[in-house]
Amino acid sequence: MVKLLDCTTRDGGYCTDWNFSDEYIFDLMSVLNKNKFSFYEIGYRNYYERNGKGPFYYCTSDFIKKFFDKKNNLQIGVMVDTKRFNETDFPNGNTDSVDFVRIATHPEMIKQTLSVAEILYERNYNVMLQLMDMKNLLTEHYDLLKKWKYKDIAETVYLADTYGEINASDLEIIYKKLKETGYKNISFHAHNKKQLALSNSIKAIKLGAYSIDVTQDGTWA
């Protein structure tokens, strides 16, 4: 069965400058647990460009511990952009208040992203990859992914329709190209610019997606 990942407060932070009340977070986590979500991506952990952004943009381990301690069956994670990654933010997954780290990258930074994944895995973090701007993945990018020796360290690789521009046929073509590079678990992150987020997500499930992203009330979709 497909897994569900909620990224309401990470993606939705674009609407609130990554400020949310504790009450909102705990209420959201309760809903996610009741509906058997697997993953909750609570926010970003980005090192650079923090000015004017709230605590869910950088999600220190100390800050999110109060939520992590009451996660019940959820796995709680953070996203880091490759271009905003700093090793000091991720000392050791065994003592950090996260279950997973999702690394977001645009196609031109895939090589650096794979190196970041290796660093995080060596530090005991569970790793996911997110390939942004999926429509612009080129042969050279698929080749990098195919040649990576450590595919198995990534729990899943996400295809992200960053600009909400793909349709179901685009998704099928790109999904199959990525599958051919040797990754067992492929997931999908939609946006709703063309009102296709739901239908594209259903298409991804039919293609065998490992997990699908959602936000409550379509926040920042």
Each language-model region and where it sits:
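Conserved N-terminal beta1-alpha1 strand-loop-helix module at the mouth
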Residues: 1-66, 70
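Short, small-residue-enriched loops and turns at beta-alpha junctions
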Residues: 11-13, 48-53, 83-87, 106-110, ...
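Active-site beta->alpha loop and helix N-cap motifs at the rims of alpha/beta catalytic domains
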Residues: 39, 44-147
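Catalytic alpha/beta core domains of metabolic enzymes, predominantly
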Residues: 156-221
